[in-house]
Amino acid sequence: MSDIGDWFRSIPAITRYWFAATVAVPLVGKLGLISPAYLFLWPEAFLYRFQIWRPITATFYFPVGPGTGFLYLVNLYFLYHYSTRLETGAFDGRPADYLFMLLFNWICIVITGLAMDMQLLMIPLIMSVLYVWAQLNRDMIVSFWFGTRFKACYLPWVILGFNYIIGGSVINELIGNLVGHLYFFLMFRYPMDLGGRNFLSTPQFLYRWLPSRRGGVSGFGVPPASMRRAADQNGGGGRHNWGQGFRLGDQ
């Protein structure tokens, strides 16, 4: 048990709380401590009955059963693996910026879920984070099942197809990929690659709550040091290789 505790405490803070909630909420529903009917995102209940907790519980809940258990475990692994890599890589020392990314993606997913009557939001949020990681490491070669190897930029779409095979749907994965692309475009590609303005900015109260560590940069739209060095070497303009500044290690 001490080994499990040590492993759990080694997970970076934001990923640790997200991971714990994604384990605890399905367990609560499975044990019947709270009826799963209160954990789904139902637009009518949220909008007209003021059951304001539903967007939160729907983000962590997943109906685990004989037909869904494997899909749940696979996505739980994706959450742990890629959120940890983002939090300790591109967002290292900047917990407020990482939390803001999660909040931005979550709000977009909730709005989409209400519009499209999506009852579960766990997979879309996980996929949005995985998509951002894949774009920041787009030229890294990753390994998938059965020894297949390809560039990281294709990983979200490979997983979309994989989840379709084992789960029978692609809507959740597609929404997650699109939301992740929206964040990546507004945060990195548009201001840094296309010379546009910054549309995203982490609120100051998040910096007061989660101050940057080790001299981390405050404020979105300012690239991590490794990307700035790559841009400087390319003359500070034009297109550049997104993956080189964000390699987080070999898969």
Curated annotation (Swiss-Prot):
Gene Ontology molecular-function annotations: ATPase binding; identical protein binding; MHC class I protein binding; signal recognition particle binding; ubiquitin protein ligase binding; ubiquitin-specific protease binding
Gene Ontology CC terms, in alphabetical order: Derlin-1 retrotranslocation complex; Derlin-1-VIMP complex; early endosome; endoplasmic reticulum quality control compartment; late endosome
Parts of the chain on the Cytoplasmic side: 2-15, 90-94, 138-154, 190-251
Keyword NAD tagged: no
Short sequence motif SHP-box: positions: 241-248
Topological region Lumenal: 32-69, 116-122, 167-170
Region: Disordered, residue numbers: 229-251
Cellular compartment(s): Endoplasmic reticulum membrane
Chief localisation class: endoplasmic reticulum
Sequence positions bearing N-acetylserine: 2
Superkingdom per UniProt: Eukaryota
Residue ranges of the TM segments: 16-31, 70-89, 95-115, 123-137, 155-166, 171-189
UniProt-listed Pfam families: DER1 (PF04511)
Positions of post-translational Phosphoserine modification: 201, 226
PANTHER family, alphabetized: DER1-LIKE PROTEIN, DERLIN
Similarity annotation: Belongs to the derlin family.
Subunit structure, as described in the record: Homotetramer. The four subunits of the tetramer are arranged in a twofold symmetry. Forms homo- and heterooligomers with DERL2 and DERL3; binding to DERL3 is poorer than that between DERL2 and DERL3. Interacts (via SHP-box motif) with VCP. Interacts with AMFR, SELENOS, SEL1L, SELENOK and SYVN1, as well as with SEL1L-SYVN1 and VCP-SELENOS protein complexes; this interaction is weaker than that observed between DERL2 and these complexes. Interacts with NGLY1 and YOD1. Does not bind to EDEM1. Interacts with DNAJB9. Interacts with RNF103. Interacts with HM13.
Protein name: Derlin-1
Organismal lineage: Eukaryota, Metazoa, Chordata, Craniata, Vertebrata
The gene coding this protein: DERL1
